[in-house]
Structure formats: C-alpha cells, structure tokens
Amino acid sequence: MGAKLLQYDEEARKSILNGVNALADAVKVTLGPKGRNVIIDKSFGAPTVTKDGVTVAKEVELEDKFENMGAQMVREVASKTSDVAGDGTTTATILAQAIYREGAKTVAAGSNPMDVKRGIEKAVAAVVTELKNISKPTKDQKEIAQVGTISANNDETIGNIIAEAMGKVGKEGVITVEEAKGLETELEIVEGMQFDRGYLSPYFVTNPEKMEVSLEDALILIYEKKISGMKDLLPILEQIAKMGRPLLIIAEDIEGEALATLVVNKIRGTLHVAAVKAPGFGDRRKAMLEDIAILTGGTVISEDMGYKLENTRLEDLGRAKRIQIDKDNTTIIDGAGERAALEGRVKQIRAQIDETTSDYDREKLQERLAKLVGGVAVIKVGAATETEMKEKKARVEDALNATRAAVEEGIVPGGGVAYIRTLPILEALKLEGDEQVGVNIVRKALEEPLKMIAANAGMEGTIVVEKVKEQSGAFGFNARTEVYEDMIEAGVIDPTKVTRFALQNAASVASLMLTTQCMIAEKPEEKGAGMPGMPPGGGYPGMGM
C-alpha cells in the first residue's frame, strides 16, 4: 500500500471548496433559457457541445486529489438528482455550492458543524413541506407539454411530442428514445411490453457503448423453472443455431453450465443469444410468463402443463420483431401473438381488476394490463449531425424524465420562483444557537438559482431576486422574454419532484462535506528519475561515446 496524504480542518474544507467551485462554476453557466453551452473535448471523435448540467459535471476531473474529492461529491449530487428526478441537475449543483460555501464560512468563524448540519436539515424539511403546499397537479396535456419544453431548453417540438406520447400510452405506458434516420423528430407508437429484469450476463451485450442487448426478429423460449444443465437445452439450441436467428431465453434462473455455455457460444458467434430472469414471483410470475407467451405467440414450457424442456419444438417459441435489454429492463416490441388471444387475456385481467379486494393486487394487475395494452411509445430524435443528435437526444431524455416527475408529484412555478416563495417559512423558523445559522445558510442558498438564471440572461441577479420577493404567488422573472410575469401562465413550470430532490440532495451532500474533518488521498508517485550515479547523456564513463 502506497503512502497517503492527509489534510485536516480548515485546509481540508478549503480544498473541498475549491473543488466544489471548479465543478459548480462549469455547470452553472448552463442554467436557464439563456444559459450558455459547454464544449467538451473527447479523446476520440468530435467535441461534444452540451447545455445539460449532469453531462458537464461527469466530465470534470481535477488534478489535485483533495480538490477532486470535493468536485466528485457535488458530481454525485447532480447524477443522483438526474437518476431519481431526471432533471434539475444544474439547480442541485448550484444549491450544493451555495450551502457549502456559506457553511464553510460559518464553520471557519467558529460555528459547530454538527449543529449547522442539523439546522440545514430542519430548514430543508420545512421547505419541502412548503413546496408540496405550493404544488398543483398537472391538469392537461398542455401543462405536460410546457414542462417538457422547459426541460428540453425551450424546445416546443420536444415538449409537444412528449405530451402526445404520454397521451397515447398513458401514465403507465413505456416511452423510449431512439435515434431517427432523418432530420425530423417524430413519435411512433409500437405495441410492446416491458418488464423489470435485465440481462443475466454483460457478455450478452450487443451495443457496448450503451451496455444494451438488441435482438432483431428474435425467437423467445419461455421456461418456468431454473436451467442449470445444458443437456435439456441442446436439442432446441441446435435447431436455432441452424436457422441463425437470435434467441431470448426467459426462465426462473439460468446458472452454472447453462449460462457459461450460452456466453461462450455468444462470444464465438455460433449463437446470437441473450438470457433474462422471469419477472415477478410465485403465481404472479406464472401469470406474467403467460402474458409474454400470448403477446409473442409462444407457449410457456411448464411441467405442470406436460411440457418438457428437452422436447421443446420451434413452434413452441414466441416471436418478436425486436427485443431490447439493458441491465435493468427487457422490452419486447411487436410480438407475433394473435390478436384474439391478446384481447381475451386483456378481458380476463380487466375482470380480475374489478373483482379483487386487495389494493396491491389491483395495482399489479393494472401494471400487467398497461404492459399488454399500453404499448411502447418510441420518440425518434432527428438531427443534422452526430454531435447535434447526441445533444438533442440527451435533452429529450431529460424532458421525458421531467414530465414523468410532473405527472407524479405536480408542478410549481419555474425559474427559481418556487424556492423564493418558501423563504417566508424559513423567516418564521426560529431555532437555537448554531442550528439557526444552518437555517440562514439555506435561506441564502435558495436565492441562488434565480440569481444565476438572471445573470445568465445578462441581468443583475440581486435586483431580480428583490423584485420577485416583493410580489407573491407565481409572479417571477421570465428570462426568455426578460419580462416579470405570472410564471405558470407563461408556461414556465418545474416538476415539484425535481425542485424537491435538487434541494434535498444538495443539502445532504453539502452538510456531509461541512462535517468533514479529515481527508485522505493517495500520494502521487514521483516521476521515475534515472538510475543513481548515471552521467548525463546515458553512456557509461570511458565508453568513448
């Protein structure tokens, strides 16, 4: 184990602050409708141009080990917010920077970090409650389109397409984003089914960049038990290998020799195969396998029904036009099942929904129904160049996540106004000693997103904040038109979930950094010098060189 470097107290907090500032300053230029672009150099290919906070955050790596720790902690805020709420990454980064910057000052001035942390936590809890009070449910497709538009950096086409997709497949439906062949961004509704099981081995992956498996015109073997030996599988695999078609195996589990053999054959290219575990548990698993069989026109190979794995015939296999699998989900698109059988199944599930008394069962049955009926909406993103395509696709994915969040928890006025409207709650929150310092830190931090949006639009942030504070409700500063107006009427809205998560994640990481007393990093290795006693020039003395 190599030697370590240590930093304590003030020195450690200073390093963290430098790292936090380096990352946050790069990310926050992208905030708001007038936010700027960031160009990122790639080791191969053209540079990436982006206005997406989390993409910028993921690229920041600092030379100083201690400063880099600070930057990585804030990067965690951005990616966690992106993963859970789908948007709000830049806002979360700005809040984390503001809370930590103010907090570090107060700790340096002698405040107790633990008390400050408790104060921050209480303030955040109060703000979250108030955000939920301000929040309004999304009423119609128009509001959903507005959320999508804002999140896609004011691209109305994207907002409208997402709203249309949600209208077509419903809240429960599955929406995926793909690259289009042409220049236009369009929406395609595909009948398909998605379940939450990913590939059993990363060796099945066909697209290493995205870590996804894509099978075109595939066969599907549906088996309800575990497969561990190869003997029973061989007869059907040999027939499929001759046909040269891709195969997806869905079983309770595939392990040991069976999994190893499939992986080896996939790597050698003899079999184009992937395997996933069956979704659900117990009786629900049987029902879901039956759903998949009906959707794809296959049969569940189940010993209860008198089928044996070794006797499986090609006609027992399901078929689908396309199957996509990532590490968490499998989507079967355009199954070859008969329409009549599918309609019968849907009718049966609807009857069960009406009869069941358990809320949990009803929820699960509705999920199954959505998977059979809802289908999959595919948003095909078109662009002129590869660079533009990547940037646009990232925006569509952001916007999609934001709209989902809006449908889930409702909306609040956008443009940093919602945070300003929670300030009176913090004015009224009176705590003891250094806990009050924590509340004041959060109060100051909540003004930062609006300040930054105004600053990126070329305005004086503090003046804009004061003007917005004087008014109430959804009144705020619309940076796109540079007009003070009712944000909700102007269509500048944010999902409550995004606004809430950005603050919670920022405060959580910032208070962790505040209560850091010591940092440990690897000592960088000295650059190897020449051998001792070697004369300059590299030759040995007396060699007549």
UniProtKB/Swiss-Prot annotation:
Q: Name one GO molecular function term.
A: ATP binding
* Subunit (UniProt): Forms a cylinder of 14 subunits composed of two heptameric rings stacked back-to-back. Interacts with the co-chaperonin GroES.
The segment annotated Disordered runs over 526-545
Family that this chain belongs to: Belongs to the chaperonin (HSP60) family.
Q: Report the top EC class in one word.
A: isomerase
> Under the cellular component aspect of Gene Ontology, which terms does the record hold?
cytoplasm
Write down the EC number.
Answer: 5.6.1.7
- Name assigned to this protein: Chaperonin GroEL 2
Substrates-to-products reaction catalysed:
ATP + H2O + a folded polypeptide = ADP + phosphate + an unfolded polypeptide
InterPro entries, alphabetically?
Chaperonin_Cpn60_CS, Cpn60/GroEL, Cpn60/GroEL/TCP-1, GroEL-like_apical_dom_sf, GROEL-like_equatorial_sf, TCP-1-like_intermed_sf
Specify residue ranges for compositional bias: Gly residues: 536-545
Membrane spanning residue stretches = none
